[in-house]
UniProtKB/Swiss-Prot annotation:
This is P protein. Contributes to a melanosome-specific anion (chloride) current that modulates melanosomal pH for optimal tyrosinase activity required for melanogenesis and the melanosome maturation. One of the components of the mammalian pigmentary system. May serve as a key control point at which ethnic skin color variation is determined. Major determinant of brown and/or blue eye color. Seems to regulate the post-translational processing of tyrosinase, which catalyzes the limiting reaction in melanin synthesis. It is a multi-pass membrane protein. Belongs to the CitM (TC 2.A.11) transporter family. It is linked to Albinism, oculocutaneous, 2: An autosomal recessive disorder in which the biosynthesis of melanin pigment is reduced in skin, hair, and eyes. Although affected infants may appear at birth to have complete absence of melanin pigment, most patients acquire small amounts of pigment with age. Visual anomalies include decreased acuity and nystagmus. The phenotype is highly variable. The hair of affected individuals may turn darker with age, and pigmented nevi or freckles may be seen. African and African American individuals may have yellow hair and blue-gray or hazel irides. Residues 38-60, 74-94 are annotated as: Disordered. Induction: Expression is under the control of an enhancer element that is encoded in an intron of the close-by HERC2 gene. The enhancer element containing the T-allele of the polymorphism rs12913832 mediates binding of the transcription factors HLTF, LEF1 and MITF and increases OCA2 expression. In contrast, transcription factor binding and OCA2 expression are reduced in carriers of the C-allele of polymorphism rs12913832. Thus, people homozygous for the C-allele have light-colored eyes, while people homozygous for the T-allele of polymorphism rs12913832 most often have brown eyes. The gene is OCA2. Residues 1-179, 348-353, 402-423, 531-620, 665-679, 738-760, 835-838 are cytoplasmic. CDD domains: P_permease (cd01116). Glycans are attached at residues 214, 218, 273, 442, 781. Expressed in melanocytes and retinal pigment epithelium. It comes from Homo sapiens.
Length: 838
C-alpha cells in the first residue's frame, strides 16, 4: 500500500506498507468485542477534503498512511471520520448502482482505503436487513464486474450502458429461473412415477434338479406385459466351456403360443432354449438372468431339465417376473437418460454430482415404470463400497500428509531436476505417474500426485489445469500395462476359464506391457503437439495469479458459511468485505503490472535458492509418521495382489491406514481433516454406480455387446479376426468413455467367450480379451467421467481452486484416446493377425 498522486505516481517520501497479516487487527478485535460504534470526530483535519461523504453506515475511510489498528482505537475518542448519521444516507448519489469500493479517490493528492465493519449500522436498522443489503450490493457489484471483465474491447462501449447491463441481468435471471423450474418439474415427475409402482420383489422357488426328472410350471401372462424375466441362482457360470457337451448343464425351455395363430389355424408353439452351465465348485454361487419376449396373453410354460454326470440332485433357485416395455424401448430410454446426464455435465448446467444423482433418479423411475423397481437395500448393494473406502481412506492420508510441507518440498525438488525447463518437468511427471499407476491403483496415484503438481505449478507460475489433465491421461495409459493397474484388467485375469487359456498374470502383463510402451512412445510427442499453441504459463505475473486465487478462496469460504446466527452473519460480512478489498487491490495491480514471461526460466538457479528458503519441511516428526504409514499401505497394496492369504481388499487397507495415521498424528480437531475430504467426489461415485447398474438393468450394456457380436458374425471368415479386434477395441473405447468400464467389462467377457466357443465363428478368445482390455482402459481418457482417476483429479483440483470443465478435458483427452487406441489396435493386428500370437 502506498500513496499516489492524481497522475498515479508514488510520492517519493511516502512510506510503502505491505499488509501480510490476514488476522483481525487488535483494534478491530476490541471494537467488535465492545460492540461500539465510532463516535463523531471532534478534532483533526476535515476529512471531507480527502474522503467522500455518503458512505456512513456501510464503510468508513482511513488515510492510507495511518496505522490501521491505531486508527480504529483512536477513533473512539477523537476520530477524524465523517459524521455518522442516525439513518440511511439520503445522498442522492448513493444508490444501488453506486460501487461499494472506489478505485481511487483523488482529493488533494491523497488516497483512502475502505474499512468495513459489521457494527457500522444505525439503531433503526436490523441486523438481517443490513446483511441482506450488503449481500445484495455485493452480488450486484460482482455481476457488473463479471460482465465488464468478460466483455471484449468491441463490446465494451455497449456494456457500459446501464440499460444493456440491466437487460442482460434480467435475461440471466430469467434463464436461471427456467433452469431451476425445469429441473424441479423433472424431479417431481420422476418422484411421482417412482412412487406409483410398488416394489414387488422376487419370489424365489427352491428346486432340486436331477437327471431323472424335470421341473415344469405354467405361468399366466399379464395383460400389459411384453417381457418375461427368468432368474436362476446357484452354482452357475456365465460363459460356456471351450468344449461344449462334456460339461454339466441345465436347459430352460420356455414354450408359448405364436401370436400369428387364428381361429382357422391352430397357433404354433414357440420354444426358447436357454442353456446354463454348472460350476464344478458347488460352493461358488452366482445369479443369472434371461429376458424372453412374451408373444401372446396365453399361458407360458417353463420346463427345466438337468444334464448331470452323477445322480445326486443339484439345488437351484428360480424366480420370474413380467416386465412392461420391449428391449428396444428400454435401451432407448437408457440412452436418453445417459445423453441427458452428459448434457448436464458438458454444458455445466448443474454440478456433475447433481447430474449423476438426477440420472440415477430418472433410471430408477424408468425401472419402476417397466415393473422392475428395486428396493432400497438392492440399490445400496449396487454401490461399490470398496472404491468409496479406498477414496475416503487415501483422502484422509493425503490430508494429514499435506500438513508436513512435503508437497512443497517435492515441488522444489522437481523444479531443480528439470533445471527450469517446463517441458522436461511435465514429461518427467507424466512418466512417473504412468509407471507408478502400472503397479498402484489409478485413483491412488492421482490422490498422491495431484497436490504435488498443483504446488509445483504455483511455484513455477504455471496453469495447473493443463498439467493435471496431461498427468491423469498418462496415469490411465500406464494403468493398462499390468494385470493389476486397472479394474478391467483385474476382472479379465480373475476369470477362471481365461486362466485355463493362458491369460494368467504373467502372460497378460507381458502382452499388455509391450503394447502400452508403444502407446507411450507415440503419446508423448502427441502431447507436445497438442500443447504447441497453448500457453502453459499464466498470462499474468505470479502475484496477480496468487491474488486471483486468494479472492476465489475467500469467496468460496464466504459462500459456504450459512448465516444461521448473528456471529456467522458477522463473519460472512467480513469475508465479503475482504473479497471486495482484494478485488480493489487486484484492479490496481492489473492496471500497473505488465510483464512478458518467456517460455524458459533463465534465472532458475536464483529462483531455486529463494524457493528452498521459502518451501521447507514444516513438521519432520509428522512427516516420518506419514511416510511410515503410507509406505506400509502401498506395500500392502502390492502384497494383496500376489499373496492370497491376505484377506483385505484395497478399501480395507486404505481405511486401516487412515486410522493408524490419525492415532499417530494425534489429531484433536477432526473436523479440519474431514473438511479436506472431497465429499462431492464420493457422492458422485455413489450416484454413478447406481446409474450404471440401473442402465444395465435397462439392457443397455447387454444390447451393445449383442450388437457387437452380430456385426462380427456378419464378416467373412477370412477377415473375421481383423474385424473382431477392430470392433472390440473401438466399441469398448467409446463405451468406456461414456459409461463405467467395470460393468461394461464384466458384461462383455461372457459375450466374447460365447463368441469364441461358437463353432460357426471360430475365433480365439485371447485376442478378443486383449482388445477389450485396450479399449476399456484407454477409452477412459475420452471424457471427464470416463475413468475414476479423472473424476478424483478434477475434484481435488476444484478443492484447491483450479477446477477444469468437461470440455477442457475433452479437448485433450479425446484426441489422446483416439491415437492411443489406434496404436493399440495396430499392435494387436500385427501380433495376432500377422505374427499369429494367439
Amino acid at each position: 500500500m502506498h500513496l499516489e498522486g492524481r497522475d498515479g505516481r508514488r510520492y517519493p517520501g511516502a512510506p510503502a506498507v505491505e499488509l501480510l497479516q490476514t488476522s483481525v487487527p487488535s483494534g478491530l478485535a476490541e471494537l467488535v468485542a465492545g460492540k461500539r460504534r465510532l463516535p463523531r470526530g471532534a478534532g483533526g483535519a476535515d476529512p471531507s477534503h480527502s474522503c467522500p461523504r455518503g458512505a456512513a453506515g456501510q464503510s468508513s475511510w482511513a488515510p492510507a498512511g495511518q496505522e490501521f489498528a491505531s486508527f480504529l482505537t483512536k477513533g473512539r475518542s477523537h476520530s477524524s471520520l465523517p459524521q455518522m448519521s442516525s439513518s440511511r444516507s439520503k445522498d442522492s448519489c448513493f444508490t444501488e448502482n453506486t460501487p461499494l469500493l472506489r478505485n481511487s479517490l483523488q482529493e488533494k493528492g491523497s488516497r483512502c482505503i475502505p474499512v468495513y465493519h459489521p457494527e457500522f449500522i444505525t439503531a433503526e436498522e436490523s441486523w438481517e436487513d443490513s446483511s441482506a443489503d450488503w449481500e445484495r450490493r455485493y452480488l450486484l457489484s460482482r455481476e457488473v464486474s463479471g460482465l465488464s471483465a468478460s466483455a471484449s474491447s468491441e463490446k465494451g462501449d455497449l456494456l457500459d450502458s446501464p440499460h444493456i447491463r440491466l437487460r442482460l441481468s434480467k435475461l440471466r435471471r430469467c434463464v436461471q429461473w427456467l433452469k431451476v423450474m425445469g429441473l424441479f418439474a423433472f424431479v417431481v415427475l420422476c418422484s411421482i412415477l417412482f412412487s406409483l409402482y410398488p416394489d414387488q420383489g422376487k419370489l424365489w422357488q427352491l428346486l432340486a434338479l436331477s437327471p431323472l426328472e424335470n421341473y415344469s410350471v405354467n405361468l399366466s401372462s399379464h395383460v400389459d406385459s411384453t417381457l418375461l424375466q427368468v432368474d436362476l441362482a446357484g452354482a452357475l457360470v456365465a460363459s460356456g466351456p471351450s468344449r461344449p457337451g462334456r460339461e454339466e448343464h441345465i436347459v430352460v425351455e420356455l414354450t408359448q403360443a405364436d401370436a400369428l395363430g387364428s381361429r382357422w389355424r391352430r397357433p404354433q408353439q414357440v420354444t426358447h432354449n436357454w442353456t446354463v452351465y454348472l460350476n464344478p465348485r458347488r460352493s461358488e454361487h452366482s445369479v443369472m438372468s434371461r429376458t424372453f419376449e412374451v408373444l401372446t396373453r396365453e399361458t407360458v410354460s417353463i420346463s427345466i431339465r438337468a444334464s448331470l454326470q452323477q445322480t445326486q440332485a443339484v439345488p437351484l433357485l428360480m424366480a420370474h417376473q413380467y416386465l412392461r416395455g420391449s428391449v428396444e424401448t428400454q435401451v432407448t430410454i437408457a440412452t436418453a437418460i445417459l445423453a441427458g446426464v452428459y448434457a448436464l455435465i458438458i454444458f455445466e448446467i448443474v454440478h456433475r454430482t447433481l447430474a449423476a444423482m438426477l440420472g440415477s433418479l430418472a433410471a430408477l423411475a424408468a425401472l419402476a415404470v417397466i415393473g422392475d423397481r428395486p428396493s432400497l437395500t438392492h440399490v445400496v448393494e449396487w454401490i461399490d463400497f470398496e472404491t468409496l473406502a479406498l477414496l475416503f481412506g487415501m483422502m484422509i492420508l493425503v490430508a494429514i500428509f499435506s500438513e508436513t510441507g512435503f508437497f512443497d518440498y517435492c515441488a522444489v525438488k522437481a523444479y531443480r531436476l528439470s533445471r527450469g525447463r517446463v517441458w522436461a518437468m511435465i514429461i518427467m511427471l507424466c512418466l512417473i505417474a504412468a509407471v507408478l499407476s502400472a503397479f498402484l491403483d489409478n485413483v491412488t496415484t492421482m490422490l498422491l500426485f495431484t497436490p504435488v503438481t498443483i504446488r509445483l505449478c504455483e511455484v513455477l507460475n504455471l496453469d495447473p489445469r493443463q498439467v493435471l489433465i496431461a498427468e491423469v491421461i498418462f496415469t490411465n495409459i500406464g494403468g493398462a500395462a499390468t494385470a493389476i493397474g486397472d479394474p478391467p484388467n483385474v476382472i479379465i485375469v480373475s476369470n477362471q476359464e481365461l486362466r485355463k487359456m493362458g491369460l494368467d498374470f504373467a502372460g497378460f502383463t507381458a502382452h499388455m506391457f509391450i503394447g502400452i510402451c508403444l502407446v507411450l512412445l507415440v503419446c508423448f510427442p502427441l502431447l507436445r503437439l497438442l500443447y504447441w499453441n497453448r500457453k502453459l504459463y499464466n498470462k499474468e505475473p505470479s502475484e496477480i495469479v496468487e491474488l486471483k486465487h486468494e479472492i476465489h478462496v475467500w469467496r468460496l469460504t464466504a459462500q459456504r458459511i450459512s448465516p444461521a446466527s448473528r456471529e456467522e452473519t458477522a463473519v460472512r460480512r467480513l469475508l465479503l468485505g475482504k473479497v471486495l478489498a482484494l478485488e480493489h487491490l487486484l484492479a490496481r495491480r492489473l492496471h500497473t503490472f505488465h510483464r512478458q514471461i518467456s517460455q524458459e526460466d533463465k534465472n532458475w538457479e536464483t529462483n531455486i535458492q529463494e524457493l528452498q528458503k521459502k518451501h521447507r519441511i514444516s513438521d519432520g516428526i509428522l512427516l516420518a509418521k506419514c511416510l511410515t504409514v503410507l509406505g506400509f499401505v502401498i506395500f500392502m497394496f502390492f502384497l494383496n495382489s500376489f499373496v492370497p492369504g491376505i484377506h483385505l481388499d484395497l478399501g480395507w487397507i486404505a481405511i486401516l491406514g487412515a486410522i493408524w495415521l490419525l492415532i499417530l498424528a494425534d489429531i484433536h480437531d477432526f473436523e479440519i481433516i474431514l473438511h479436506r475430504v472431497e465429499w462431492a467426489t464420493l457422492l458422485f461415485f455413489a450416484a454413478l454406480f447406481v446409474l450404471m447398474e440401473a442402465l444395465a438393468h435397462l439392457h443397455l450394456i447387454e444390447y451393445v455387446g449383442e450388437q457387437t457380436a452380430l456385426l462380427i458374425k456378419m464378416v467373412p471368415e477370412e477377415q473375421r479376426l481383423i474385424a473382431a479386434i477392430v470392433l472390440v477395441v473401438w466399441v469398448s473405447a467409446l463405451a468406456s468413455s461414456l459409461i463405467d468400464n467395470i460393468p461394461f467389462t464384466a458384461t462383455m467377457i461372457p459375450v466374447l467367450l460365447n463368441l469364441s466357443h461358437d463353432p460357426e465363428v471360430g475365433l480365439p478368445a485371447p485376442p478378443l480379451m486383449y482388445a477389450l482390455a485396450f479399449g476399456a482402459c484407454l477409452g477412459g481418457n475420452g471424457t471427464l467421467i470416463g475413468a475414476s482417476a479423472n473424476v478424483v483429479c478434477a475434484g481435488i483440483a476444484e478443492q484447491h481452486g483450479y477446477g477444469f470443465s468437461f470440455m477442457e478435458f475433452f479437448r485433450l483427452g479425446f484426441p489422446m484416446m483416439v491415437v492411443s487406441c489406434t496404436v493399440g489396435m495396430c499392435y494387436l493386428l500385427v501380433a495376432h493377425v500377422v505374427v499369429g500370437w494367439n
